[in-house]
Amino acid sequence: MKNVLKVENVTMQFGGVVAVDNLTMEVNEGEIVALIGPNGAGKTTAFNVITGVYAPTNGRVCFNEKCIVRNHPTGKMKKIYRGEDPAMYTAQLAPEEALEDEALKAWKQAQKERDEYAFSDHILAPTPDKITALGMARTFQNIRLWKSQTVFDNVLIAKHLRRTSNLFTAALHLNGKEETRQRAEVLELLKLVGLEDVKDELATSLPYGKQRRLEIARALATDPTLLLLDEPAAGMNPQETDELTAFIG
């Protein structure tokens, strides 16, 4: 069975607080795996590390056998400062731990190319949007829908991440075909989560349970290999929880 996700010895510290302590886990293709723990145990922080929101204090994350997140070699970097000056790093480190010339060159090259990557561990580590493009999607513990958009448009916007339009296709007027295809796929996703009848309503007008399902549809719109659901049943009533459990299963 193919390994999709491997989390190796991940620790995440914020000052003196250890939010995640030496987490190791694997997810294989076709598996449903639950990360269980009480409130405040660090589940959301673990998801944030896996999806590139945080750079871990120690450990690494591999997705489809490729390392996508790993700690700074000193083990003392608590946070990535995306797109900022290397001085932001050296100010946090002792003089003997200042960034090497190789690291500075890598940062300058990234800035020159205006790459949407964060600088960490002398490599260009993918940001959350790049990790999503690699095939990993997630939902959030606190709902983060686009409030001013309809149910349909919330999913369509996410679908555009996979759009393959370019200058060549535009010149041949092929963009319209892709737009039609994506709109059809959005409708299929809304049917899958039982929201096709409210597709034209504003996302925030939906009951809480349906907003949760919309978040899942939006995540699925990116065509992920791996889908991370952060407490998907939080705040739901028993009926909504049962419906969601049946859907996930």
What are these regions (language model features)?
Residues 2-249:
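Glycine-rich phosphate-binding loops of nucleotide-dependent enzymes
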